Amino acid sequence: MNHNHMPGADMKVFVVEDSAAVRERLIEMIREIEDIEVVGEADNYDAAVNGIMNTRPDVAVVDIKLADDRGSGIDVLNQVRKELPAMKAIVLSNYATPQHIKASADAGAEYFLDKSADFERFTEILEQMKSGTNAH
């Protein structure tokens, strides 16, 4: 039995973001949504891969640039998807280049959000993912 799981939580989310301020804001935004639980957070590649594998979230919210040089958020997704193919992903980044958007999609991300332009869509997208509707 998973003792970290809140009764009634419909969706478990893991947050991977190198900036503590942004990570805390994302977690605040997630906690405002009913029936969604934050099961972990990380700021670097190893902590992200280990945390996601241990908590097995429904959704990973991943920044591309992480706090170390071991790998990017896209590398994290490529690694954990081998074991968790059903996990959904939202990539959040300041690097909204065609290459990053394509690499995110290739890694299986359902959404790519530009932090400067799309940040406020984050909760709307999580709500839609929770209810099973597609927000594309």
Residue ranges: model-predicted function:
Residues A96-L113, A117, E124:
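Alpha4 helix (beta4-alpha4-beta5 surface) of REC/receiver domains from two-component response regulators
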